[in-house]
A protein has these predicted regions:
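Mid-chain, structured segments of secreted extracytoplasmic proteins
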Residues: 63-107
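Vicinal oxygen chelate
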Residues: 35-37, 90-137
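Short beta->alpha transition motifs characteristic of CBS
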Residues: 124, 144-147
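Core segments of cupin and vicinal oxygen chelate
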Residues: 31-71
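N-terminal beta-strand motif that seeds the catalytic metal site of vicinal oxygen chelate
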Residues: 17-37, 88-92
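Exposed loop/turn and edge beta-strand positions of beta-sandwich/beta-sheet ligand-binding modules
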Residues: 58, 86, 127-128
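Bacterial Sec-dependent N-terminal signal peptides
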Residues: 1-22
C-alpha cells in the first residue's frame, strides 16, 4: 500500500502534460498608421476592404475585415516610427486579380514584382500571379491571384 502513491506519482509524471493540442486561428493584423483617415481611405478604395465596428471603442483605432473572420486593425494612437522592409508584409488573395490590377493602374498606384520592377506582375512557379504595393505609411502588401 505504501507504494501506491509512488506508483500513481510515477504514472502522472510519465504522462505528457502537453498532450492536448492548442488550436489557433488567425484573427487579425494590426498596423500603426500616422494618418488614420488617409489610411482608411486607402484600404477602402484601393483594397476594397469593408470597415467593421471597432469593438474596443478606443478613439484612433479602426477595424476592417478581409473576409472569413480575418481583420486588419489600423492604430493611430502610437506615435513611434516603425521600421519597414519588404519581408515584413501581409498578403491577400483575390479571384479578381486582373480587375485589381486595373484598379491600381486607374488610380496610378505603383506596384511591383518581388525584385522591385515597377508595374510588373510576378508569376510564381505554381502559376499564382502576385504584386507588391505599399500603403500610405509604407507597409508592404502582397496581392495574389487564386489558382
Amino acid at each position: 500500500m505504501k507504494f501506491l502513491p509512488i506508483l500513481f506519482l510515477m504514472i502522472a509524471l510519465n504522462s505528457p502534460i502537453y498532450a492536448q493540442k492548442l488550436n489557433f486561428s488567425f484573427n487579425h493584423v494590426a498596423i500603426s498608421v500616422t494618418d488614420l483617415e488617409r489610411s482608411c481611405t486607402f484600404y477602402k478604395e484601393v483594397l476594397k476592404l469593408e470597415e467593421i465596428t471597432n469593438k474596443t471603442k478606443v478613439e484612433g483605432i479602426r477595424w476592417f475585415t478581409t473576409g472569413n473572420g480575418i481583420e486588419l486593425h489600423l492604430i493611430s494612437t502610437i506615435k513611434e516610427r516603425v521600421k519597414i522592409n519588404k519581408a515584413v508584409h501581409f498578403a491577400l488573395s483575390t479571384k479578381d486579380f486582373d480587375k485589381f490590377i486595373q484598379n491600381l493602374d486607374g488610380k496610378k498606384i505603383p506596384y511591383s514584382d518581388w525584385p522591385g520592377t515597377p508595374q510588373k506582375i510576378n508569376v510564381r512557379a505554381d502559376g499564382i500571379r502576385q504584386v507588391f504595393l505599399q500603403d500610405p505609411d509604407g507597409y508592404w502588401i502582397e496581392v495574389n491571384s487564386v489558382s
